[in-house]
Amino acid sequence: MKNQNLSVRKLARCGMVAALYVVLCMALQPFSYGAVQVRVAEALCLLPVFGAEYIFGVVLGCFLANLLGSTIVDVIFGTLATLLACLVTYKLRNIRFKGLALAASLPPVVFNAVIIGIEIAVMFPDPTSSAPLWLACVTNGISVGIGELISCTVLGVLLVRIIEASPSVRKVFEA
């Protein structure tokens, strides 16, 4: 019975994380979508630092948010980028720099910069530009990467720090 209660608790936490991701994206919609974006909900990509079950919650939230506010291509590739980012974030969860989860914040930045940068360049080419596709991919990747740095390396690391600093809050997030 105790294992069943633990599973129900983990499932409930995943559902809450997914819902929070969607709510943050919808509430901050002008900032959450497009080539220039700071998707505040991406700070939640650092929650796998506290357990693998958060991978599912964040990925589900990303999938639903993209389903509600983006294209089918972004539903697929944006969700894939978030899945890969969360998996690697989980693997890097114990690497700390001066006590901060900085290493864990980098996978969302890198995966989203590369995957979404390419997606935007291919799906929304600038008809007024004669620049090669690779340059558009790099330019869009830098733009997305800067937004992800703000969301994950600033807000996400701060979120992890706040959770870890409070034993009662940390207990809620850990298995």
Regions found by a protein language model. Give the residues of each.
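Hydrophobic transmembrane alpha-helices
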Residues: 2-56
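Small-polar-interrupted transmembrane alpha-helices in polytopic inner-membrane proteins
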Residues: 21, 58-66
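Membrane-embedded alpha-helical hairpins and interfacial helices in multi-pass inner-membrane proteins
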Residues: 30-35, 43, 63-81, 88-175
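Membrane-helix interface "capping/anchor" motifs
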Residues: 48-58, 93-102
